[in-house]
């Protein structure tokens, strides 16, 4: 029996986290859809406050507080953490669940795209990458613009999340851990399907805006600016613009030589499209 078949037959243990905070609407949407799918016991360990754009930052110079959280939906357990998304993952895996690690970590659903160069800044991605470094497969989930995708009824959202979770467990984990970065498009068109693509170079974050002077101090605010797009847009960019879900592998490694060969990437694509076709989705 294959490892994926075994995963399909057992009830999973899934850790949920995010960077928008444990109270965020995206977490509520994720939990409610996973509860409908009813294939896993859900545990939430998420920031007590907004932690967007924290990437893989950790809290070193002050205590981090872990508190039980009375989550409004029937999860197996929930805790808030007074720190970053990576703090949440490290505390969950090294303390709360050290004797029985989760099968999978789902990070999100982030309000806003984490495509392109946003992967370097995103706390949603930071949590997923940290999880893979700790030996647990992970998926980062982000919705561009708003959460309209999860109100659409043109296909079964709970079943899609279940299948995506099982697919993530089938990815090759050695010699370099791989997280999945999933971005849902913002469009008034009907959602068409999924595409497995490489991460593009587009970005729009961290533009400094001068606000005012306070004595000798100058006050700035960093916020998103216009999207910077290449002359020939990336496949990831075009995928989202065409109302497809963009799924990209993110490797958790420091080696510049640790990339997929074209043949390896194409093999991953074939496996992914077999999965997408099983859901009746276009690609």
From Swiss-Prot:
It is found in: Cytoplasm. Belongs to the SurE nucleotidase family. Nucleotidase that shows phosphatase activity on nucleoside 5'-monophosphates. A divalent metal cation binds at residues 19-20, 52, 110. One of its GO terms (molecular function) is 3'-nucleotidase activity. The gene is surE2. The keyword rRNA-binding does not apply. Gene3D superfamilies: Survival protein SurE-like phosphatase/nucleotidase (3.40.1210.10). InterPro entries: SurE (IPR030048), SurE-like_Pase/nucleotidase (IPR002828), SurE-like_sf (IPR036523). Binds 1 divalent metal cation per subunit. It catalyses: a ribonucleoside 5'-phosphate + H2O = a ribonucleoside + phosphate. It is an enzyme of class 3 (hydrolase). GO terms for cellular component: cytoplasm. Keywords: Cytoplasm, Hydrolase, Metal-binding, Nucleotide-binding. HAMAP family: SurE. It comes from Chlamydia caviae (strain ATCC VR-813 / DSM 19441 / 03DC25 / GPIC) (Chlamydophila caviae). This is 5'-nucleotidase SurE 2. Its EC number is 3.1.3.5. Its cofactor is a divalent metal cation.
């Amino acid at each position: 029996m294959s490892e994926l078949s075994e995963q399909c037959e057992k009830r999973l243990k899934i850790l949920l986290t995010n960077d928008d905070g444990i109270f965020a609407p995206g977490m509520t949407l994720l939990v409610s859809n996973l509860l409908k799918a009813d294939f896993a016991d859900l545990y939430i360990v998420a920031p007590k406050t907004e932690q967007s754009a924290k990437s893989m930052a950790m809290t070193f110079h002050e205590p981090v507080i872990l508190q039980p959280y009375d989550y409004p939906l029937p999860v197996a357990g929930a805790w808030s953490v007074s720190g970053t998304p990576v703090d949440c993952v490290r505390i969950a895996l090294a303390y709360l669940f050290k004797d029985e690690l989760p099968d999978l970590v789902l990070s999100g659903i982030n309000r806003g795209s984490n495509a392109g160069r946003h992967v370097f800044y995103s706390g949603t991605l930071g949590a997923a990458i940290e999880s893979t470094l700790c030996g647990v497969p992970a998926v980062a989930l982000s919705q561009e613009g708003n959460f309209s995708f999860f109100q659409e009824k043109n296909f079964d959202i709970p079943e899609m999340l279940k299948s995506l979770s099982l697919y993530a467990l089938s990815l090759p984990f050695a010699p370099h851990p791989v997280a999945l970065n999933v971005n849902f498009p913002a469009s008034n068109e009907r959602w068409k399907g999924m595409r497995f693509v490489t991460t593009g170079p587009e970005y729009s974050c961290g533009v400094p805006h001068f606000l005012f002077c306070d004595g000798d101090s100058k006050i700035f605010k960093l916020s998103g600016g216009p999207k910077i797009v290449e002359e020939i847009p990336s496949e990831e960019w075009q995928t989202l613009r065409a109302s497809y879900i963009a799924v990209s592998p993110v490797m958790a490694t420091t080696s510049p030589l640790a990339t997929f060969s074209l043949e390896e990437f194409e093999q991953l694509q074939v496996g992914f499209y077999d999965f997408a076709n099983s859901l009746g989705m276009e690609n």
